[in-house]
């Protein structure tokens, strides 16, 4: 995505994070470059405010600053807060319980993180989503062009990729290769999940396939 980024931990204990990168695509297309950044990160940059400058400018749902109406290639919003994501997923499932068809499928809520200047994906080469599968629910087997990486953000369940199935819990990572059937069953409960559901963080290279008009998906819906 041609975006500078740095790694540092200002906390007093170790941390771990996931780097969602488009390096495999750049490697295959021989378009990968490496450049050194600055030698030093300023003290101000090492301090994380309660609300960053980007959030104060861009983090207002449905609103954008008139001082910055132009489209930007990647999202200027540097933090997407979990409280907002959690509320959006919970509201989708609540609306479903009220009889509204506002989820991806029964028991499966999902949101996509977007670039507030375009409404499109946060990066031109990477799509980022959060999925919530209600306890006891199972997603329909789906296959798509493009590859995805999932992290179990919360809860537990059993996932099936192709002809293999295994149990997952919070912190687990797994990959779904292109055009490989994938489904997830939530086995979460209040004892292992704050929401009582299986929460899956996903990033994929779908924007690349859509730009090349090579996107395709197929969902196995249950027979009526």
Task: Outline where the language-model segments fall.
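Conserved hydrophobic/aromatic beta-strand scaffold that supports enzyme active sites
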Residues: 4-6, 112, 128-132, 149, ...
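Conserved metal-binding segment of the jelly-roll/cupin
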Residues: 1-10, 17-18, 22, 161, ...
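A short beta-strand-loop-beta hairpin characteristic of the jelly-roll/cupin
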Residues: 1-3, 138-170, 185
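Non-heme Fe(II)/2-oxoglutarate
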Residues: 131, 201, 206-210, 216-219
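Intrinsically disordered, low-complexity terminal tails and inter-domain linkers enriched
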Residues: 188-195
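A short, N-terminal "cap"/entry segment at the start of jelly-roll beta-barrel domains
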Residues: 35-36, 42-125, 129, 216, ...
